[in-house]
Amino acid sequence: MDTIVIAGLGNPGSKYQWTRHNAGFLFLDRIAQLEGLSIVRKQFGGLTAEWERKGKRLVLLKPQTFMNLSGRSVMPALQFYKLKPDQLIVVHDEIDLALGAARLKQGGGHGGQNGLRSIMELLGKGDFVRLRLGIGRPPHGDVTNHVLGVFTPPEMEIFARVLDGALDMLETALDEGVPKAMSLFNNKSYLEG
């Protein structure tokens, strides 16, 4: 059975649960809710669950290392399952995408995202798929306060649609390949219901 690790990035603890930086955790929580899974197994310095879907074993991983050390959780998972970087999908917040947007990307740099930076440092490269969930830049002020800030209720309403759209995107990528999913979904906006 093919195995893919889907790492949703975020920070552990209730203090960070609804912050923009926890977009990856929120995405995995949405999958767990829809599929009747519990992401509670302690492995690889994180919490995991396995989702069997169409002949694939999908390991949902929420690193509990804090964002800046995400690679310390992702790398052991890849080693345990003997996987290559192209068998990894990282789901993360993206300040360079507006709230209401989600994009798939194959490879690339870290763009200042510290969780990606940590993973790339340990892998030695960035040849993995990223599912980028837009949180937008702050209109003015500190980026750190923005990413660690909690979604407002109107923002959360939009972000809930982003999560469902991103799940459609992920399922298409798994079933038909990343290029097909990118062509179908990368220009969609989830601002309106």
Swiss-Prot record:
PROSITE patterns, alphabetized: PEPT_TRNA_HYDROL_1
Cellular compartments per GO CC: cytoplasm
Keyword Lyase among record annotations: no
Active site as annotated: 21 (proton acceptor)
Site (Stabilizes the basic form of H active site to accept a proton): 93
UniProt catalytic activity: an N-acyl-L-alpha-aminoacyl-tRNA + H2O = an N-acyl-L-amino acid + a tRNA + H(+)
Family (UniProt): Belongs to the PTH family.
Free-text function comment from the UniProt entry: Hydrolyzes ribosome-free peptidyl-tRNAs (with 1 or more amino acids incorporated), which drop off the ribosome during protein synthesis, or as a result of ribosome stalling. Catalyzes the release of premature peptidyl moieties from peptidyl-tRNA molecules trapped in stalled 50S ribosomal subunits, and thus maintains levels of free tRNAs and 50S ribosomes.
Protein name, per record: Peptidyl-tRNA hydrolase
